[in-house]
From Swiss-Prot:
Residues 211-248 are annotated as: Disordered. It comes from the Eukaryota. This is Heat shock protein 83. A motif (TPR repeat-binding) lies at residues 697-701. It comes from Leishmania amazonensis. Homodimer.
Amino acid sequence: MTETFAFQAEINQLMSLIINTFYSNKEIFLRDVISNASDACDKIRYQSLTDPSVLGDATRLCVRVVPDKENKTLTVEDNGIGMTKADLVNNLGTIARSGTKAFMEALEAGADMSMIGQFGVGFYSAYLVADRVTVTSKNNSDEVYVWESSAGGTFTITSAPESDMKLPARITLHLKEDQLEYLEARRLKELIKKHSEFIGYDIELMVEKTTEKEVTDEDEEEAKKADEDGEEPKVEEVTEGEEGKKKKTKKVKEVTKEYEVQNKHKPLWTRDPKDVTKEEYAAFYKAISNDWEDPPATKHFSVEGQLEFRAIMFVPKRAPFDMLEPNKKRNNIKLYVRRVFIMDNCEDLCPDWLGFVKGVVDSEDLPLNISRENLQQNKILKVIRKNIVKKCLEMFEEVAENKEDYKQFYEQFGKNIKLGIHEDTANRKKLMELLRFYSTESGEVMTTLKDYVTRMKAEQNSIYYITGDSKKKLESSPFIEQAKRRGFEVLFMTEPYDEYVMQQVKDFEDKKFACLTKEGVHFEESEEEKRQREEEKATCEKLCKTMKEVLGDKVEKVTVSERLSTSPCILVTSEFGWSAHMEQMMRNQALRDSSMAQYMMSKKTMELNPKHPIIKELRRRVEADENDKAVKDLVFLLFDTSLLTSGFQLEDPTYAERINRMIKLGLSLDEEEEEEAVEAAVAETAPAEVTAGTSSMELVD
């Protein structure tokens, strides 16, 4: 007997929306149908814990996918709990779920169709690819019933004989003509791997297997005849003589159908980390990341209590070439809810600086109506994110225990650690412990800030550092001369990110950072050193004043330096302005903010080394005649040279002319000799005069 029912208004509206609106991402229907089958298996499994008889003859729970090209149907079966007649009527038609209206509102707000399963109405996604759906189900407490609808506003319920049922539940999709691609084994395998690989039960796909079989001509003829007549092949006795004759054989192709398990990679995160081998982690990592190399670090953990989720995080061996591109969409951490795949680009699950970490998060608590639109406001997700960051930091600390392993890690992902210091204020202290730098004392091995502090001299009051292009350049920088003389270690910061890091951090373990290229650097001095410094300032006062007048607005001031010991002079920037290295970086940016650059590129201060012979001689000449023309030339030359040695860019093109004049003076050349040399050079390069009788054509030849 067949009964007809009308869909509840909201469900009818939802089905109409699904059928009449074009969605490009129709493939999600299979995910939702398999997910429902998995839920049915979960329910029967829970019941069997108290009543094992509910499983009947079932030895294991599974989900089967059967494509039928001849009838253009795709069937999904499971041996889960099944549905009664009342369940079919209520759950699939007459009682609207809370998610129905919520999902339609989300669609109107711009949500993606792929979120349908998370609103508890995933069953209806079947109508994305099918024009008719049939559900045959058998619950232990009821008979077999068939639910069927073509989404025309009504559905029917019909009783059926139990002999029709192989498994307790079967949903058959009668595919639309333009959706027959979902009958291809290759396409189905792809979708199962993408969306349902970590379902807790075997997903078996019916596939065709072609094998070659060797048969005799007589066997083939008998088989054909039996097929035509519908009779069983005759069995005849064969005498020894007949059997001894050699029969002709040939190979024929035989097509068989069999079930093939598709989700062979079981969800490792549900297992105890102690029971998972390194090889299993590596295989799992390669499956989710498409990487070919084993991960050097793994963190497998679970969080229980008010919030429950499991996760596995991996550090890849190499950084992707486009890792830090701002517009790159990252899909490194896959989000599952109760082992059902939700999304692979959940940007709010992990901060940008951890964009290189790959892994899986499976939550038991995220609501079914989670969507991209409300992920940011979801409190559960924020707690998950906080725990992921915490566990990743623990993983990095574990890697750091082995210096060689951490060296490789830092080469690949040191920039991310520095980006984290810039962005993540809550974890800045822990991230700073992961930093590594070369220094004047470390040689070819990088040092930690913690180790630096333990090596600090008793009279040292700051952590000294210098920024620049390379370690080699910084080792010979004039800025570190006095620090080296006093035995103070200086950190070399050679990456662009270091500049941004030092803008955010001011101290480490109560020791302030001091940039040796900026103003405000003071070393602890004895009373004798202080007295001597005051004398030098007084002695050089007139020289400093004269040099400031000559240089004008090129410098803010000229003072006696505390940081030089062998170089004549340097240029330093203000304490809160850009360093020379930062200024060069900003100049090279195509989209730089000119107004900001003008503000941050503060006036430079020229510092003199009063003990240097050049400065002593210059001071003597100024005191003898402050209007000496040679003094002005020397001051400009010293300034330009200081620009170069301090890491700035030359802006005055006359620098080369001044150098040439200095070379002439060194060679004791006067103006007349120079003019004669120039005239001789011009004469040598001039074309020879055309002799009489030589034609222009001959010259051309």
